[in-house]
């Protein structure tokens, strides 16, 4: 797994100027990409997220990961960013229907006992996840 710098979008509650400043400032750090955590996924948040993604690309982030943690409005699919459509615990992931996910989307699953890690990875594969993370604790 690469080195990602992280910016918390606070589901659209963080002022956009603060988000953009953080994106520009973090571009100077060694990185393989940027993780825009707790991104809004609804139509109302699309404009601010689109601007953050454009700025991230402009300042040198080739890989942008959006983490709304749930399925998104279709407009997000055109932003040129990878999207995590699941961010939750292992019990929730096992119950999740996968509705709203597209092949290649990301899945972040925490609370996975070590003995269940391989099962969680297989479940991600069956659900068409393009990338993901299985962890015992939530570290992101």
What are these regions (language model features)?
Residues 1-140:
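Glycan-processing catalytic domains of CAZymes
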């Amino acid at each position: 797994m690469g080195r990602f710098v992280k910016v918390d979008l606070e589901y659209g509650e963080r002022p956009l100027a603060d988000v953009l400043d953080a994106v520009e400032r973090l571009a100077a750090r060694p990185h393989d990409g940027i993780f825009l955590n707790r991104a809004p996924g609804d139509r109302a948040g699309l404009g601010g997220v689109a601007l953050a993604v454009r700025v991230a690309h402009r300042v040198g982030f080739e890989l942008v990961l959006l983490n709304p943690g749930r399925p998104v409005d279709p407009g997000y699919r055109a932003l040129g960013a990878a999207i995590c459509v699941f961010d939750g615990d292992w019990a929730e992931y096992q119950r999740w229907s996968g509705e709203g996910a597209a092949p290649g989307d990301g899945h972040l699953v925490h609370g996975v006992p070590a003995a269940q890690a391989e099962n969680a990875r297989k479940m991600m594969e069956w659900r068409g996840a393009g990338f993901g993370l299985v962890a015992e604790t939530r570290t992101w």
